[in-house]
Amino acid sequence: MIAPNFPRSSIPSPAKLICLLLCFAQLATLVPQTHAQKTTAQPTLEISVGANNTLVIPKSALGKEHLLSVSRIPQALAATSTGLSGKIVRFELFADGVDLYESTEGLVVTKDLPARRLMTTFPIVEQDGTKVVIDFNRGMRRLYTDIWYDASRRFDPVGRDETLEIPQARVFSATKQDNQIVIRQSVQVRNRQFSSNLEQQFEVRYFLTPYVSGGYSGKEAPASDLRYARFFESQAQLEESTGRSSPKMARFDLSKPVVFHYSANTPADYVQAVKDGILYWNRAFGTNIVRAEKAPDGVTAPDPRYNIVQWVPWDAAGSAYADILIDPRTGESRHGQAYMTSVFALSGKARARALLRAMRDLAAEKADGKKDKHDAFGGWPATGGVCEVNMAEFAAQYAQGLQELLANDGLTDEAALLASQDYVREVVAHEVGHIMGLRHNFAGSLAATLDLKELDDWFKAYVAGDKLDAYTNRYASSSIMEYTVFKAAVQVGWFIRTQPEALPHDKAAIQWGYFNSESPREGRLLFGTDDQVGTYGDLQRFDVGADPVVAAYSQMSDNIRLLPNNVIETFIAAKAPRDPRDRVPLAEVNLWPTRDAISISGQFSSMLGWFNQNARSLRVEQPFDFIGDLNQKNRAEAHWKSLNDQVERLGGVDRAFFSFLPVDLKLDLKEAPKGVGAAEKVSATNLLARLKTLLAAPAYTNFVGLDEKRYSFTPEEKELILKRGQSLFEDLEKELVKQACVRLETVKRDLGGEVADSVAEDDITAKLEQRIIDLAKLVLTAKDDGKRLKGKVDKSIVEVLDFKYDDETRLAAAKALNDNTGSFKGWATDAKGDLNKQLKDDMEGALNIGNFKDFKDSMLSRTLREWYMKQQEILKLLPPKAGQPPK
């Protein structure tokens, strides 16, 4: 609406004035009302810094409230910060020292009963009639461990008082910056309960500023809205008399611009990407409230004067991360910092290969059971913040994304750089979103408007430099606060760079948190954060797509397709590492079929998991007004329908669950998958042929190494790669069958029965279980003409044709027919009985057992006796049919 425009010479009549006022009143209702409040004037800091980093406290400042904010900074790996919970404190003078007390406001239910919360006592260095000088270093020998935000929304009187001991410390710097004192203390930290012999090194940075109440009132998020959006919140405080816990949302005061400074060491290639990631949030606010400026040289995070996006040169980092220092009473965000690590920066193909090697090593290290090192802070990771991720998960998905990028024949250094710039845009916007208060939204992928095939097509066109007009206003996630896989993150970064709007959930969440909009609830927007990841199967970190079964199938397909590329990249990393000291002779390069099989079968297991009645989907359950026993049946029906729809999209049970296995089953593969590429069958012959083709392709005949130099494989090296690849693919065939059988042993399939109250004869569960029986029969009975065992039965020499699959695989196949995981208890009874008879007859015939009146296994020679005992172990898992006569 446009306000009336009067000529300068005209003087409106009273009636016109009333009309004008009404128009402006109406206009005001159309403009979003910010939560910005007129802040009370900040009092001047009276405390100053004295000689030798002491604090000089005027006696007029004693008893006055101050805000003490704290960041702890590890002194290993990267010196990045994690904010701890701020405290409102006051100084009080006694004869032998100056006490520091925490305010009891919000920590006790009544002021009628006196309470004092002593934090520490500082030794007095000197004093006179107007001031007292204290030794901050000697007094501050305990470090409170509660972090700046709270996830529980409940008042925790114990957790907020947990401390660590500081046996050694040195305040090496104390300065007054603007209206704050910044104290930097180097400490050794010890946990008195756990790891008492471990003393970790940290810098503890204290920020002390005068505090006055009443200028900014915080906001408590309505609990009923948290299903649709959520902000970080302060540690909960108690309301007087009622004792009700009340956390406050972490938000900036919008009465002034929110300025972010990107650090001066940000590489020139990424400055614009970082700025774009910061300024993205203006689209969500609907106004240019957020600004991006370069930080002065020498300024690094955390700094109380700036919100900083700090570039961290760290190629092996597990993520980027952020945190905020907030007012513990109101939730007002005072300043925040995001740490943007160089792991996201790909300046070209060589850099991509170097990062691929680093991510593979990191993922392999975690897969081998080497857990993250934790510090003494009750298990907090050594680098922390609100975006701490599982490093193995991050490394695995990033390695997969880099591999897919490098697999593009037309990839140029320019395309790799552009992809990394868009990746940085996405990551910076994500971290700045945290600083603005937003929590993760791992449901962003569930509201994607690109299906998996469209995302693949977009990525290929993007790398090739083709036009992308067909993807305007399409996105792989509805929220920047999602953890997306590499190509989806690049797509979202491209969206930020090319589209004028914010992603839907980002805008709705900001409008809800800062302007009291009800759009998240009204639109029933999909939202799920960290503490819900274990509740919903489709709420995962680093997933992609709206349908979890289809997404897992797509991921499995990618894993299989890229196997030959993985082989070549492994040899490239050995031949041309980033540092020549890391070069490995190609003959010593190892490949891991078990690891590849576990990766592929992991996605297979994820797909099967949706047959379990306890599996829950956020996307399926979001339309329900409530979640409970009263609508359990309705929700199960919705889950069953979703599962059937996804299996149908994949071309049916045979296509979805068995077509990739390297076995000869009679499958119905008439229907092709819709919206996703078909997973190819794992075949050593086909994979070896593709490996040979790739070695002859331009991308690998003359390639850029990790050190940015040009290399080629010699004919002898190519022959070695092909032989090693052939061994890998042949072993992978066998290992994948075993891993698939292992997964089938533990995955329940009772959802269909929960919906129908009875077991159907031809639904997808029945079809799945019939194929499980077929697979088990094949694995248990298949013979290998090249494997023959010779030995004696009593005095007779016999030759036994051995089975194709090893004993461990056959045992797994037999266990896959167990009663506990099927749609009903006796689902495989007949099949097990038939197998028992077939295997028993085969074994007894091979050993001529029928010729002996009283056969004993002691009559067998060593080789045959071992074989016989293993068959007996399998037969125990396959009970004979009732009434079947024993032999």
Regions found by a protein language model. Name each.
Residues 1-14:
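N-terminal secretory signal peptides that target proteins for export/translocation
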Residues 18-29:
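Bacterial N-terminal signal peptides
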Residues 27-41:
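Boundary at the C-terminal end of the N-terminal hydrophobic targeting segment
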Residues 38-266, 295-415, 424:
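Auxiliary tRNA-acceptor-end handling modules of aminoacyl-tRNA synthetases
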Residues 60-63, 68, 72-73, 267-291:
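Zn2+-dependent metallopeptidase catalytic core
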Residues 384, 388, 407, 411-415, ...:
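Conserved catalytic/binding loops enriched for acidic/polar residues
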Residues 420-436:
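Short alpha-helix carrying the canonical HExxH Zn2+-binding catalytic motif
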Residues 432-448:
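Catalytic Zn2+-binding segment of zinc metalloproteases
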